[in-house]
Amino acid sequence: SKNLVAALIYLMIKQQDAAGLTTFDEKINLTIPPKSKTSHLNLLLKAMHNSKIGGETDISTLLHSLAESIHKRGLVILVSDLLDDEEKIIKGLRHFRHKGHEVIIFHIVDPKEKSLDFDNNINFIDIENNDELTIDSRQIKKDYVKAFDQFCNYYKNKCLKNNIDYVQIDTTDSLDISLMQYL
């Protein structure tokens, strides 16, 4: 996901569009206001490189806060696994739309997360809080895959209804394939 964000920042600044960056978990960790100068590119890329992924998040609350703090209309891009309350995330994204922003979601999905393609017991470790859970994937695979498809379809449908672009990104795809899905 960091490479995707870096590529998007690069493309925006090379087109002389302003690009900024906000990283967050339970709170906003970093905000760099948008600028279109080429010199701004290094600052954004360094900040993206140094940002930490993981930790618990409260996406929906932070989306509302950000929507209120960004006064100039523009393009808002959310790169996330979207593992939070789906309805609250959509409400937060609609807040941006209400303020006149265009919104794109890049939903980051690992193929094994999508298919639960494991043969035996799996020990899951939550990257946000290190909780552990061991399960036999064969016992839950069918129900899990159905639930995951419903989860993704919820976002696709709600985004379509609210004029929000939704792009599912496979973590095993190369950067050019990921970008071509949207561009």
Question: What kind of region is each of these model predictions?
Answer:
Residues 2-183:
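Exposed, interaction-prone extracellular/peripheral surfaces
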